[in-house]
């Protein structure tokens, strides 16, 4: 909890800014016991007097009064400015320019209150490239840079303007980073050490009643659109299939699910194979957050180490493949699980709920929340090495 700010300072994020006057002490005329004018023993350093008049003492008294009055005036204005109902200090609106909207040539409507909907005021998103010279930050999504569908306006870049590299893909599916040495100042990604950290989801405190757990009629499900035998998830599925009933959906299986069908379908399953397409640092996607937790199925996680998942969810909210020595051992554990043990995986639902963070507008609005705290002089000289680590 931040240290309370005393009346002699103004609170700013992460620091205290002193007002332009020294620390106040009690005036000398309050703290000093005055000597009488007709003292019979003035002492060797007594002030010269004329008929009981002490000029130096009188000046000191007036100086103390003036200092005290100055302090009271400044303190009054400080209290008046911070009183309830007083006019707030206006904050300038930040403009975040999205150079190319992710995965589309048609950006969504971006009204002025877009970021207000996500709890961030004084923040404006725009896809209008004519604002390049005045934007407070410019965001470049990597996929369009990778395919050269979008090019960097290096010759038009205003001096000192922060540029943001954005990507929610894994390093295995991110190429061409060597072309961007010494260009970007900040990174927006799912990595926890990113300048703008935007996970695919998170758990938040539950504000209403707990929703009932959907009835289960099937064992395990998996939605896969891009099946490649060389991937670890494909190999693990091949090893599990002889021991575990897995219903496979998605384009790769010829059984695609419509957007409105996805969660109701997966809710009927006890387990969901939340297998990431590649295993990288902090790479936990909608497969875990949406297809499993939000649908009401227990995630069977293949991705980063268990400790990474436990940074986001309780340790008893999921099954991790690393906890088992073989696919067969994992399958036996899932099939033989009794009802009491199974329901224990949902204990978190009594106090928490899933918040999905898949909207790019919300992700970009997060830049404004982080903006005051990010170093302007920072540059990623070797973005590829950082992201591939």
UniProtKB/Swiss-Prot annotation:
Its EC number is 2.4.1.-. It is found in: Golgi apparatus, Golgi stack membrane. One of its GO terms (biological process) is regulation of type IV hypersensitivity. N-glycosylated. Residues 1-55 are cytoplasmic. Catalyzes the transfer of L-fucose, from a guanosine diphosphate-beta-L-fucose, to the N-acetyl glucosamine (GlcNAc) of a distal alpha2,3 sialylated lactosamine unit of a glycoprotein or a glycolipid-linked sialopolylactosamines chain through an alpha-1,3 glycosidic linkage and participates in the final fucosylation step in the biosynthesis of the sialyl Lewis X (sLe(x)), a carbohydrate involved in cell and matrix adhesion during leukocyte trafficking and fertilization. Its main location: Golgi. InterPro entries: Glyco_tran_10_C, Glyco_tran_10_N, Glyco_trans_10, GT10-like_C_sf. Glycans are attached at residues 128, 338. GO terms for molecular function: 4-galactosyl-N-acetylglucosaminide 3-alpha-L-fucosyltransferase activity; alpha-(1->3)-fucosyltransferase activity; fucosyltransferase activity. This is Alpha-(1,3)-fucosyltransferase 7. The chain crosses the membrane at residues 56-78. Belongs to the glycosyltransferase 10 family. Residues 79-389 are lumenal. It is a single-pass type II membrane protein. Pathway: Protein modification; protein glycosylation. It holds the Pfam family Glyco_transf_10. The lineage of its organism: Eukaryota, Metazoa, Chordata, Craniata, Vertebrata. It comes from Mus musculus. PANTHER family: ALPHA- 1,3 -FUCOSYLTRANSFERASE (PTHR11929), ALPHA-(1,3)-FUCOSYLTRANSFERASE 7 (PTHR11929:SF12). It catalyses: an N-acetyl-alpha-neuraminyl-(2->3)-beta-D-galactosyl-(1->4)-N-acetyl-beta-D-glucosaminyl derivative + GDP-beta-L-fucose = an alpha-Neu5Ac-(2->3)-beta-D-Gal-(1->4)-[alpha-L-Fuc-(1->3)]-beta-D-GlcNAc derivative + GDP + H(+); an alpha-Neu5Ac-(2->3)-beta-D-Gal-(1->4)-beta-D-GlcNAc6S derivative + GDP-beta-L-fucose = an alpha-Neu5Ac-(2->3)-beta-D-Gal-(1->4)-[alpha-L-Fuc-(1->3)]-beta-D-GlcNAc6S derivative + GDP + H(+); a neolactoside IV(3)-alpha-NeuAc-nLc4Cer + GDP-beta-L-fucose = a neolactoside IV(3)-alpha-NeuNAc,III(3)-alpha-Fuc-nLc4Cer + GDP + H(+); a neolactoside VI(3)-alpha-NeuNAc-nLc6Cer + GDP-beta-L-fucose = a neolactoside VI(3)-alpha-NeuAc,V(3)-alphaFuc-nLc6Cer + GDP + H(+). Inhibited by NaCl. Inhibited by GDP in a concentration dependent manner, with an IC(50) value of 93 uM. Also inhibited by GMP and GTP. Inhibited by N-ethylmaleimide. Activated by poly(ethylene glycol) by enhancing the thermal stability of FUT7. Activated by Mn2+, Ca2+, and Mg2+. Both panosialin A and B inhibit activity with IC(50) values of 4.8 and 5.3 ug/ml, respectively. Inhibited by gallic acid (GA) and (-)-epigallocatechin gallate (EGCG) in a time-dependent and irreversible manner with IC(50) values of 60 and 700 nM, respectively. One of its GO terms (cellular component) is trans-Golgi network. It comes from the Eukaryota. Highly expressed in lung and bone marrow and to a much lesser extent in spleen, salivary gland and skeletal muscle.
